[in-house]
């Protein structure tokens, strides 16, 4: 993937506005609530019986931070996102058996959380660059599946 200087700047600037400890848990909780079948990968997380339980679940919050922390690696390695996520892709495929479509669902939920949080600070032209970035990350995470 080729990134223009403007796209790189947009992603870096947007990332600087993201509070990992806030956005990560919200994005993962949204996935688990909106797409309840994704809960099967989190059987050890305890009570995921309803939206309030998911949003108040400390393990969901902690893993949401981990997920967003991993996303930061892509921000810092935009020229080699696939290489950056090679081992993580392999883990999710071979050990965790995660359906790769779930990465797209998480990206969509993350985008919704960002749009909600940033409001007017997340106009369509910034979302377009963000969507490209998320698509590259999803592709990289899905690489070991095919």
From Swiss-Prot:
This fish has two hemoglobins: cathodic and anodic. The cathodic Hb and anodic Hb display small and large Bohr effects respectively. In addition, the cathodic Hb displays a reverse Bohr effect and appreciable phosphate effects. SUPFAM superfamilies: Globin-like (SSF46458). Red blood cells. Residues 2-146 form the Globin domain. The gene is hbb2. This is Hemoglobin cathodic subunit beta. Heme b binds at residues 63, 92. Keywords: Heme, Iron, Metal-binding, Oxygen transport, Transport.
